[in-house]
C-alpha cells in the first residue's frame, strides 16, 4: 500500500510541476557544467595543497594564480546555481498560475480569481 501512496504523490507532483523537455535539458546542462567545475576545483585544491606543503618559492608563487582560478570557479558555480534556482522558480510559478481560488502566488500577490458567496 505504501508504494501506491508514493506513486500517487509522485504522479501528483508530476502533474502539478510539469516541465518541458527544453527546461529539463537546460537543467541537465547546468548541472553537468557545475559538476565539471567542481571536479576542476578538486584538482586545483590538491595542487594548491601540494605546492603549500613543498614550501618552494616558485610553487608558492604559483598558488596565487591557482587560488584566483579557484575563486573564479566558485563565483561561476554560484552564478549557475542562481540561474538554476531562478529558472526553477519561474517554471513552478508558471505551472501554478491556474491553481485554486484564493491562493497566493510566490510573489505574495493574490490570484485574480474572485470568490462568490452564496446567499
UniProtKB/Swiss-Prot annotation:
Main location (coarse class): nucleus
Induction: Follows a light-dependent circadian-regulated expression with a peak at midday, about 6 hours after dawn.
An example Gene Ontology biological process: rhythmic process
Signal peptide limits: none
Cross-referenced Pfam families: Elf4 (PF07011)
Keyword Nucleus: yes
This protein's record includes keyword NADP: no
Region described as Disordered: 91-119
Subcellular location: Nucleus
Transmembrane segments: none
Single GO molecular function: protein homodimerization activity
Purpose of the protein: Component of the central CCA1/LHY-TOC1 feedback loop in the circadian clock that promotes clock accuracy and is required for sustained rhythms in the absence of daily light/dark cycles.
Description of how the protein assembles with itself and partners: Homodimer.
Database matches in PANTHER family: PROTEIN ELF4-LIKE 2 (PTHR33469:SF15), PROTEIN ELF4-LIKE 4 (PTHR33469)
Protein's UniProt name: Protein ELF4-LIKE 2
The organism of origin for this protein: Arabidopsis thaliana
Lineage of producing organism: Eukaryota, Viridiplantae, Streptophyta, Embryophyta, Tracheophyta
Amino acid at each position: 500500500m505504501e508504494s501506491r501512496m508514493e506513486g500517487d504523490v509522485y504522479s501528483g507532483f508530476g502533474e502539478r510541476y510539469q516541465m518541458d523537455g527544453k527546461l529539463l535539458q537546460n537543467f541537465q546542462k547546468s548541472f553537468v557544467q557545475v559538476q565539471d567545475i567542481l571536479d576542476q576545483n578538486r584538482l586545483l585544491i590538491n595542487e594548491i595543497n601540494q605546492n603549500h606543503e613543498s614550501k618552494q618559492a616558485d610553487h608558492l608563487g604559483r598558488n596565487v594564480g591557482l587560488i584566483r582560478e579557484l575563486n573564479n570557479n566558485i563565483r561561476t558555480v554560484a552564478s549557475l546555481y542562481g540561474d538554476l534556482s531562478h529558472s526553477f522558480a519561474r517554471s513552478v510559478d508558471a505551472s501554478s498560475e491556474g491553481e485554486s481560488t484564493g491562493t497566493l502566488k510566490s510573489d505574495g500577490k493574490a490570484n485574480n480569481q474572485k470568490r462568490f458567496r452564496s446567499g
